C-alpha cells in the first residue's frame, strides 16, 4: 500500500512552483510506489467513485492516455472533452465552465494554450485542477522526467546534471529551468540567446537556486553546455499550423543545437541518457518530417534517428512515467 502525502489533498497542480521541493519529491516517491504496485498487480484503489474531466483544447496522445489509464487503474472515471466538444471560451466563459464542471467532477485536467485559462479554471472550479500543458508550463512532464532520471542514475537528484537543447522560450524550457532549480539540480539551458527563457523566469530560477543549491547555466555553446551532463533533453522545433517562414527561421537558428551522437560524446559521459517529451521528428515517418525534408533536405530535426533509437535513449520509459506520475498527482490530491 502506497504512502499517500495527505498535505496535497485538494491542491491544484498548475505549474511546478505550486509544490515545494519536499512535496515534489514526495510525489516522485508515491509514483515509484504506484508503479511498482501496478507491475505487481497489487494496486490499492484510492479513487473509487471519483470523476475527472479532461479538457483538451490542444490534442495529445500521451497526456490523454496517461490521465485515462491512471484514473482507470485507480477506479476513477474520466470524461474527455476535445476541442470540438467543449464550449469553453467560445460560447461559455472559462469562469462559467469551471463552475459547471466543478459541480459534476472531482477534478479537472486542462491542456491548452494560455496559462491564464488553467489559472481561471482553478480559481472558480472548487475542485483540484491539473495543467496537462500550456504554452508557459508543462508540470506533469517534469514529474515524469524527474522519475525517469532517478531510475536511470544512481545519483541523488541534487547531483544530477542535465542539459536542455533547443527553443527554451516556452513550456519545456521554462519547466526544465525552474524544476531543476527547485530540486537543487545542475541545470543547463543550451540555446541561441534569442531563444532563452524570459528574464523573469530566469530570475525566479536563480532565487530558487539560492535556497536549493542548484547550479544554473544558460549558454549558446553546445560543448560547454553538455559537458559532464547525465541527461540531454530536447523538444520539437516546429508545430503544425505555423507559417513556413517561422519554420525556416527556427530551423536556421537551431540547426547547431540538434542532438546528435557527437553532442552525446561531448558530454564525456558514456552512460549519458537522452530525454524527449515526444512526439519527435527523428525520421521521415511523419507528415511534418516529410515536409521538412522536401523543403530543407533534412532527415531529422531536433534529434537524429541514431540517437533516438540508441541505447542512450530512454524516451519510452519517460513516456510510460507520464502515467505513473500523473496517477501520483491524482491520488495525492483526490484520495
From Swiss-Prot:
L-ornithine binds at residues 171, 235, 239-240. It is found in: Cytoplasm. It comes from the Bacteria. One of its GO terms (cellular component) is cytoplasm. Carbamoyl phosphate binds at residues 60-63, 87, 111, 138-141, 277-278, 322. It catalyses: carbamoyl phosphate + L-ornithine = L-citrulline + phosphate + H(+). Pathway: Amino-acid biosynthesis; L-arginine biosynthesis; L-arginine from L-ornithine and carbamoyl phosphate: step 1/3. The keyword Amino-acid biosynthesis applies. GO terms for biological process: arginine biosynthetic process via ornithine; citrulline biosynthetic process; L-arginine biosynthetic process. GO terms for molecular function: amino acid binding; ornithine carbamoyltransferase activity. Keywords: Amino-acid biosynthesis, Arginine biosynthesis, Cytoplasm, Transferase. Its EC number is 2.1.3.3. InterPro entries: Asp/Orn_carbamoyltranf_P-bd, Asp/Orn_carbamoylTrfase, Asp/Orn_carbamoylTrfase_sf, Asp_carbamoyltransf_Asp/Orn-bd, Orn/put_carbamltrans, OTCase_ArgI. Gene3D superfamilies: Aspartate/ornithine carbamoyltransferase (3.40.50.1370). Reversibly catalyzes the transfer of the carbamoyl group from carbamoyl phosphate (CP) to the N(epsilon) atom of ornithine (ORN) to produce L-citrulline. HAMAP family: OTCase. Belongs to the aspartate/ornithine carbamoyltransferase superfamily. OTCase family. PANTHER family: ORNITHINE CARBAMOYLTRANSFERASE, ORNITHINE CARBAMOYLTRANSFERASE, MITOCHONDRIAL. This is Ornithine carbamoyltransferase.
Amino acid at each position: 500500500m502506497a504512502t499517500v502525502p495527505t498535505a496535497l489533498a485538494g491542491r491544484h497542480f498548475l505549474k511546478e512552483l505550486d509544490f515545494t521541493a519536499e512535496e515534489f519529491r514526495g510525489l516522485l516517491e508515491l509514483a515509484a510506489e504506484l508503479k511498482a504496485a501496478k507491475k505487481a498487480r497489487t494496486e490499492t484503489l484510492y479513487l473509487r467513485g471519483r470523476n475527472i474531466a479532461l479538457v483538451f483544447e490542444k490534442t495529445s496522445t500521451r497526456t490523454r492516455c496517461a490521465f485515462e489509464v491512471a484514473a482507470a487503474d485507480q477506479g476513477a472515471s474520466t470524461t474527455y472533452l476535445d476541442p470540438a466538444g467543449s464550449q469553453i471560451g467560445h460560447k461559455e466563459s472559462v469562469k462559467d465552465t469551471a463552475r459547471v464542471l466543478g459541480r459534476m467532477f472531482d477534478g479537472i485536467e486542462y491542456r491548452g494554450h494560455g496559462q491564464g485559462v488553467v489559472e481561471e479554471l482553478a480559481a472558480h472550479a472548487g475542485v483540484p485542477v491539473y495543467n496537462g500543458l500550456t504554452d508557459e508550463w508543462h508540470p506533469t512532464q517534469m514529474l515524469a522526467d524527474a522519475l525517469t532520471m532517478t531510475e536511470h542514475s544512481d545519483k541523488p537528484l541534487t547531483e544530477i546534471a542535465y542539459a536542455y537543447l533547443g527553443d527554451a522560450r516556452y513550456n519545456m524550457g521554462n519547466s526544465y529551468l525552474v524544476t531543476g532549480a527547485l530540486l537543487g539540480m545542475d541545470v543547463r539551458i543550451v540555446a541561441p540567446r534569442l531563444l532563452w527563457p524570459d528574464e523573469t523566469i530566469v530570475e525566479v530560477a536563480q532565487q530558487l537556486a539560492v535556497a536549493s543549491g542548484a547550479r544554473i547555466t544558460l549558454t549558446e555553446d553546445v560543448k560547454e553546455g553538455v559537458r559532464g551532463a547525465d541527461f540531454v533533453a530536447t523538444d520539437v522545433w516546429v508545430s503544425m499550423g505555423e507559417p513556413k517562414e517561422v519554420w525556416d527561421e527556427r530551423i536556421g537558428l537551431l540547426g547547431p543545437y540538434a542532438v546528435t551522437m557527437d553532442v552525446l560524446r561531448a558530454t564525456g559521459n558514456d552512460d549519458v541518457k537522452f530525454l524527449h517529451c515526444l512526439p519527435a521528428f527523428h525520421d521521415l515517418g511523419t507528415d511534418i518530417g516529410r515536409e521538412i525534408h522536401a523543403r530543407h533536405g533534412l532527415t531529422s530535426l531536433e534529434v537524429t534517428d541514431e540517437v533516438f533509437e540508441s541505447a542512450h535513449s530512454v524516451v519510452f520509459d519517460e513516456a510510460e512515467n507520464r502515467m505513473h506520475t500523473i496517477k501520483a498527482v491524482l491520488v495525492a490530491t483526490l484520495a
